Amino acid sequence: MPPAIQCLDSSRYFPKVKANDHINLTIEPHQIFGLLGPNGCGKTTLLHQLQGLDAPTSGAVKVLGLDPRRDRQELMARIGTQLQEAQVIPRLKVIEVLTTFGSFYPQSQDPMMVLESVGLAAKAGAFVDKLSGGQRQRVFIALALIHNPELLFFDELTSALDPQSRLKIWDILRDLKAAGRTVILTTHSMEEAQTLCDRIAIMDAGHIIAEGTPDELIDEFAQGSTLKFSVSGTVQPAPLEKISGVTSVDIQGQDVTVIGKGDFTPHVMQVLTDQHVSPAHMSLNPATLEDVFLHLTGRSLQA
């Protein structure tokens, strides 16, 4: 089985912008793959090439072993993409929208079965413009699934949704992966990427600057977990700095911050005991993908 996606030294240049610059990326099938990066980093340009809407200036891209431009008609029957809200007629019923879109394909699934899979069977007779934001997003997922594609592209699928709606969509994406599909997910939510994605590529300024599993990226690029506490006495920093795995110690008056990798907290506690200092208001925050992105780019993803 070929990779779901291959970018082979692909670049896309515009007169004054290198939107994609020498992209090399292989995405294996049957996983949720996250594509992260700030606005303007080149994600949309890359997605357009993968969907056959544009072609690289140099290099090549392959999707399911096909050339997205040359083989676009064949590819469209095998991939599903998320529509934007303006592309759906609001005064149609949900079942009518799915039936209409299903008619565009030589083979499509039963609309009610698809609605059942996204938890919207009870809304089949509802008008699209009467649905909640989370329900409309599930309609868009159903439309992407109507022809039973192997590969799915979703762009900011849960942005602006309430937590309950977001969790429902996360469950749907997990079900799609369990059913053997490949999902390409672009998101600004580091929590979403860390929770859902098997592998992640981080883009910035037209380049892929890191790629791996969430744990691999955190282990390689994040400074580590952050331990914060306050003290009533004086803490000598040198013994804390010598603890294996500790990468940073910052003491501001009574507030102490220790950053490190591995299980360094018990050793910090021992140092405090040896110095006859009792910590208070202690909190431990594990390293996250947000820390990785900040380390790699010097800014948060929301910036």
Role assignments for model-derived ranges:
Residues Q223-R299, A303:
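Short, charged/small-residue-rich alpha-helical element at the C-terminal edge
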Residues I5-C7, R12-A205, A210:
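ABC transporter nucleotide-binding domains
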Residues I79, L173, F221, L296-T297:
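Hydrophobic aliphatic residues
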Residues F14, G102-Y105, F221, S244, ...:
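A broad structural signal for alpha-helix termini and local helix breaks/kinks
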Residues M1-S11, R299-A303:
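ABC-family P-loop ATPase nucleotide-binding domain
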Residues D171-I259:
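ABC transporter nucleotide-binding domain
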